[in-house]
């Protein structure tokens, strides 16, 4: 991390299910910038373990965990957009970090690990959507090479009102 504290990144395993669910619930309660509200997650620990096992065994999808002092502090993942030939080159990236650890370099480390994985998996384009008001996330994504390619003014219908989404992509073959 920026302050010199060690941060360990590794692929999630099914044994991480309880901690990943805890982290998911916390991160999704701490901000209105993520896709879901905590209560919308219906995954049980067994469901999460099955999901993580599939990611662990996949050649083209992954969930990466960030640990500080043995505690899971954030996750990021790569998911194929689809299996059809015309879109097989594209993957989507998602990331969530506990608020206590924002601005400490974990996000950048997770992003770089995801980008490296996506390249090795053979993807040519990584995509993400970010709430336009999430300026720190937009700066992070731009810092690692993502560029805006569109906007959706009514992308999220949050409890607080409409949230504009910025559509971003990183071309991995350039």
Model region roles, listed by residue range:
Residues 16, 105-107:
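Conserved G/P- and acidic residue-centered "switch" motifs that form tight phosphate/ATP-binding loops
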Residues 22-39, 55:
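Helix-loop element at the rim of GNAT/NAT acetyltransferase active sites that forms part
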Residues 107, 111, 134-137, 154-159:
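Short glycine/proline-centered loop/turn elements that form peptide/ligand docking sites
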Residues 111, 118-129:
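Conserved GNAT acetyl-CoA-binding A-motif
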């Amino acid at each position: 991390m920026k302050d010199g504290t060690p941060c360990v990144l590794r692929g999630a395993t099914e044994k991480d299910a309880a901690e990943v669910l805890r982290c998911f619930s916390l991160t999704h309660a701490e901000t209105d910038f993520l896709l879901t509200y905590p209560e919308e997650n219906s995954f049980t620990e067994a469901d999460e373990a099955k999901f993580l096992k599939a990611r662990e065994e996949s050649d083209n999808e992954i969930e990466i965990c960030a640990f500080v002092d043995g505690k899971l502090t954030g996750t990021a993942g790569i998911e194929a957009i689809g299996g059809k030939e015309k879109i097989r080159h594209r993957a989507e990236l998602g990331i969530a970090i506990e608020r206590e650890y924002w601005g400490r370099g974990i996000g950048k480390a997770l992003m770089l690990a995801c980008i490296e994985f996506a390249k090795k998996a053979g993807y040519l384009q990584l995509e993400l959507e970010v709430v336009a008001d999430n300026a720190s996330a937009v700066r992070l994504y731009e810092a690692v090479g993502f560029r805006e390619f569109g906007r959706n003014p009514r992308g999220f219908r949050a409890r607080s009102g409409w949230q504009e989404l910025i559509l971003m992509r990183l071309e991995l073959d350039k």
